[in-house]
């Protein structure tokens, strides 16, 4: 059962790409976007909003998406680009990059959220789209698995910040590490909690 009205899509072809992002809220690292065109002949069971799935389930589904989707791509906008553009515009840049990186050209986009990313391919926004359409759910999963792996890699280089645990979000642990150690090169300088602890 869902609280959402039925999703009406103005496209009935086979090149519909779901688009989603992960990483707008963290204080460190890139914002990551993914675009996925599912193959109706190879359905993937269990696609949902990545935040509702266990890490083990997300990893298994990410493998299935890469193997069974008609096309998929992941892209990002760096912390430097976030600082230069702001997080809103950087998120849309990452989305456009993911759409452009698809090995099969999308004909229609379903984008999670309430703003289109400014791509020339037509489409529509879907609020809570990762819960309402499988292609957006698949994009959410790929983006989160990719970004989480980046945070684990950053944790291995800087374990004192705890990135593997909080994934860069402004948790008490992360804020305490910032206060104690200061920001890393990978931190987003334009975000207030980071700006506060930068050395002048």
Curated annotation (Swiss-Prot):
It catalyses: Endonucleolytic cleavage to 5'-phosphomonoester. Its cofactor is Mn(2+); Mg(2+). Manganese or magnesium. Binds 1 divalent metal ion per monomer in the absence of substrate. May bind a second metal ion after substrate binding. Residues 14-200 form the RNase H type-2 domain. Its main location: cytoplasm. Pfam families: RNase_HII. One of its GO terms (cellular component) is cytoplasm. A divalent metal cation binds at residues 20-21, 112. One of its GO terms (molecular function) is RNA-DNA hybrid ribonuclease activity. Gene3D superfamilies: Ribonuclease H-like superfamily/Ribonuclease H. The keyword Cell inner membrane does not apply. It is found in: Cytoplasm. Disulfide bonds: none annotated. One of its GO terms (biological process) is mismatch repair. Its EC number is 3.1.26.4. Keywords: Cytoplasm, Endonuclease, Hydrolase, Manganese, Metal-binding, Nuclease. Belongs to the RNase HII family. Endonuclease that specifically degrades the RNA of RNA-DNA hybrids. NCBIfam families: PRK00015.1-3, PRK00015.1-4. This is Ribonuclease HII. It comes from Chromohalobacter salexigens (strain ATCC BAA-138 / DSM 3043 / CIP 106854 / NCIMB 13768 / 1H11). The lineage of its organism: Bacteria, Pseudomonadati, Pseudomonadota, Gammaproteobacteria, Oceanospirillales.
């Amino acid at each position: 059962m869902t609280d959402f009205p039925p999703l009406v899509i103005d496209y009935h072809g086979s090149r519909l790409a779901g688009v989603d992002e992960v990483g707008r809220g963290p204080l460190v690292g890139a914002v990551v976007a993914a675009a996925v065109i599912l193959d109706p002949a190879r359905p993937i069971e269990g696609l949902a909003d990545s935040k509702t799935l266990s890490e083990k389930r997300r990893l298994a589904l990410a493998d299935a998406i890469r193997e069974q989707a008609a096309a998929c791509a992941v892209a990002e906008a760096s912390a430097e680009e976030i600082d230069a553009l702001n997080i809103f515009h950087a998120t849309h840049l990452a989305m456009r990059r993911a759409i452009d990186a698809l090995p099969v050209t999308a004909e229609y986009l379903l984008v999670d959220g309430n703003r289109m990313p400014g791509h020339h391919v037509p489409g529509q926004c879907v609020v809570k789209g990762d819960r309402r359409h499988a292609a957006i759910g698949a994009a959410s999963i790929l983006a989160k698995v990719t970004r989480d792996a980046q945070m684990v890699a950053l944790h291995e280089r800087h374990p004192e910040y705890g990135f593997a645990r909080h994934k860069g979000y402004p948790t008490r642990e992360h804020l305490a590490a910032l206060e104690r150690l200061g920001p890393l090169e990978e931190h987003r300088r334009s975000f207030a909690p980071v700006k506060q602890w930068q050395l002048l």
